[in-house]
Structures are given as C-alpha cells and as structure tokens.
Amino acid sequence: MLGWTLVFLVVAVIAGLFGFTGIAGAAAGIAKIIFFLFIVLLVISLLINALKGKSPRL
C-alpha cells in the first residue's frame, strides 16, 4: 500500500509542477485538476493504510 502512496505522491508533484509553473500552457487547467485528483487519491491511500494497521511494504 505504501508503494501506491508513493506513486500518487510523485504523480501529484509532477502534475503540480506542470500545472502551476506555466510549462503546460493551455493544459494548465487540466494539470491542476489532475494534481488535486491525485492528492485526494494519496490521502485515501494513506487513510486505508492507517485503518488496516498493517506495516507498510516497500
């Protein structure tokens, strides 16, 4: 589960870099939506991992 958390974090950071720095140009709006979507998925993944009480796997 920790693996998915790290994947969501990396994708959210990359989407944020493209969305908030203007590199994406016309796609900045889409990048912002994707950024927040993956932040939500990151939080959900962290909560599920915490509720299961299992030790994280790498």
Curated annotation (Swiss-Prot):
The keyword Acetylation does not apply. GO terms for cellular component: plasma membrane. Pfam families: DUF1328. It is found in: Cell membrane. The keyword Cell membrane applies. The chain crosses the membrane at residues 6-26, 28-48. Keywords: Cell membrane, Membrane, Transmembrane, Transmembrane helix. It is a multi-pass membrane protein. InterPro entries: DUF1328. Belongs to the UPF0391 family. This is UPF0391 membrane protein Shew185_1413. It comes from Shewanella baltica (strain OS185).
